[in-house]
Amino acid sequence: MSVSAAVAAASTSRTLVLARHRSPPASRVAATSRGRPFSSGPHPLAVSPATRAPAMATDGAAAAAAAGSKKKKEVLIFDAEEDLAVSLAKYTAELSAKLAAERGAFTVVLSGGSLIKNIRKLAEPPYLDSVDWSKWHVFWVDERVVPKDHEDSNYKLALDGFLSKVPIPTGQVYAINDALSAEGAADDYETCLKQLVKNGVIAMSQSTGFPRFDVMLLGMGPDGHIASLFPGHPLVNENKKWVTYIKDSPKPPPERITFTFPVINSSAYVAMVVTGAGKAGAVQKALSDKQTSSDLLPVEMAVLQDGEFTWFTDKPAVSMLQNK
């Protein structure tokens, strides 16, 4: 899907499933994972009936663009971040089992920020022992061009909070070459991805011609940015490169590399993990029916061509939504 098509689809295709998650006891969480195959429908932890937000009407070219995004965006709302973390771990572990069995590899894309804290349950029982970590291949949706041991490094954040606690083979964790310039690091990372597509580690989307990662675990900034794709920045319109670079990030540090929207939108699964009242305004705009293509936030441009998009949120993050 081109970026322009993604913009049109984001502004016209607004069917959502809103599911409120009560705080289930640990015994119930464990029970939901037994005797139930992985489902691409509502997540097994949805313990109350889902409601549907009305979809906007579509017409003409906008409807044609939206046709590339027929999958609903499911919005899961948790009473507490702890319950969100439990459900996110289960979601990821089930995808790992399903897709590793199908493909022989499981490609996971991480973001920085609070996402690493949100996936902490994967490094605890039962997942620490039950997940086949040897099949995992880990990438970053964006990275700051700083040394790997720098406090701003997304690699360091993930290493300290997650990767050092699980037995993923070192050679299957793909950090950037921090000795290169931003442009050089972006080109080098894209070259790495193309080689992994050639080797069959990363799938290729037959519909878009871009790499198809198994799952992206993403966060969102208070301004609605995802990856290092910021509101109003020209990079949101990049539609040829897989990985590009930015030297004038509005959020420090200024030099970064980032996946482009065609890569993000070719994913098989995306979990958008957003917590806290500070992001409620962006969540409200992203999930509102009242949109125009001229004022989309980057998070609204994440429209999967042929995949499943799930929001993992807590009550403060959706506090400005009317139908929460």
UniProtKB/Swiss-Prot annotation:
Record's catalysed reaction(s): 6-phospho-D-glucono-1,5-lactone + H2O = 6-phospho-D-gluconate + H(+)
InterPro entries in UniProt: 6-phosphogluconolactonase_DevB, Glc/Gal-6P_isomerase, NagB/RpiA_transferase-like, PGLS
GO cellular component: chloroplast; cytosol
SUPFAM superfamilies: NagB/RpiA/CoA transferase-like
EC class of the enzyme, as a word: hydrolase
Biological or metabolic pathway of the protein: Carbohydrate degradation; pentose phosphate pathway; D-ribulose 5-phosphate from D-glucose 6-phosphate (oxidative stage): step 2/3
Cellular localisation: Plastid, Chloroplast
Gene3D superfamilies: 3.40.50.1360
Alphabetical GO biological process terms: carbohydrate metabolic process; pentose-phosphate shunt, oxidative branch
Transit peptide: first to last position: 1-63
EC code: 3.1.1.31
Predominant localisation class: plastid
A molecular function (GO) term: 6-phosphogluconolactonase activity
Top-level taxonomic group: Eukaryota
Stretch list, region Disordered: 19-43
UniProt entry keywords in alphabetical sequence: Chloroplast, Hydrolase, Plastid, Transit peptide
Function: Hydrolysis of 6-phosphogluconolactone to 6-phosphogluconate.
Record-stated family: Belongs to the glucosamine/galactosamine-6-phosphate isomerase family. 6-phosphogluconolactonase subfamily.
The protein's name: Probable 6-phosphogluconolactonase 4, chloroplastic
